[in-house]
Curated annotation (Swiss-Prot):
It is found in: Cell membrane. Its main location: membrane. This is UPF0391 membrane protein NE1120. InterPro entries: DUF1328. It comes from the Bacteria. The chain crosses the membrane at residues 4-24, 27-47. Belongs to the UPF0391 family. It is a multi-pass membrane protein. GO terms for cellular component: plasma membrane. Pfam families: DUF1328. Keywords: Cell membrane, Membrane, Transmembrane, Transmembrane helix.
Length: 55
């Protein structure tokens, strides 16, 4: 439990540093692009997996 608290604390400190440095906006844009790319790939692979395999 203490390990998880330490990990979340370090993530919060890193987020604070990035936020005050002005890098957070660029990283948020990159995260949004990666999220939508992953979402599109998930849908594509789901639809491709629904086909019956060739005999």
């Amino acid at each position: 439990m203490f390990n998880m608290a330490l990990v979340f604390f370090l993530i919060a400190v890193l987020a604070g540093i990035l936020g005050f440095a002005g890098i957070a906006g660029t990283l948020a844009w990159a995260a949004k692009v990666l999220f939508f790319a992953g979402l599109i790939l998930t849908v594509v692979f789901y639809l491709l997996g629904k086909r019956t395999p060739p005999v």
